[in-house]
Amino acid sequence: MTNTEKRAVILLSGGLDSATVVAMARAEGYACYTMSFDYGQRHRAELDAAARVARDLGAVEHKVIGLNLSGIGGSALTDSSIAVPESPSEGIPVTYVPARNTVFLSLALGWAEVLGARDIFIGVNAVDYSGYPDCRPEFVESFERMANLATKAGVEGQGFTIRAPLQNLSKSDIVKAGIALGVDYALTVSCYQADDQGRACGKCDSCRLRAEGFTASGMSDPTRYF
């Protein structure tokens, strides 16, 4: 690392979207510091996927933060008593994890301030997505304003930018962009119910969006199913 390198902290779940974001940041010349969270999610295979993606795309450092969001509950992803739906539903789905992106971005902000990074990347999307309130442009813009009010760096004029490069892309556009940038999607796990080997259920909303993205893009889908 040198003082001339520009650094970015990137939220990396291990799924298709966040892997694409790492590749985009790398293509822009960023030294990539990736951050994942062991938050009590039922699909823990995504943590192994995140480590694989970070390694494959040359992250400078990959950090896994332990959180116990299952202690809060309220989501099918953190509470085993709530079933993951296998068909689209009206409104905000039960797979929404309360305040998840707010918590994740806050910790990424802390690491960015320590690293001297001014850019934080997140793979939220408002086109082909599940309807989560913390994936909307208004949320990203509001968090950026808060970040620059709540930090020493922000107060001293070294502002942060929250980058959401997938915000207005369709899932097929994301797939095409990632493949053009060399993302190996076989390393990724998107399924909400993935088994320990990272194989997907093929039924949940995340699996549906992923499959539709590959089909619409005309690209080969490397997803493994159980």
Curated annotation (Swiss-Prot):
Say if the entry is tagged with keyword Ligase. Answer: yes
EC main class here is: ligase
Positions bound to ATP: 12-22
Q: Which UniProt keywords apply?
A: ATP-binding, Ligase, Metal-binding, Nucleotide-binding, Queuosine biosynthesis, Zinc
Swiss-Prot/TrEMBL cofactor(s): Zn(2+)
Q: Which reaction does it catalyse?
A: 7-carboxy-7-deazaguanine + NH4(+) + ATP = 7-cyano-7-deazaguanine + ADP + phosphate + H2O + H(+)
The UniProt family comment states: Belongs to the QueC family.
Q: What is this protein called?
A: 7-cyano-7-deazaguanine synthase
Q: Which gene encodes it?
A: queC
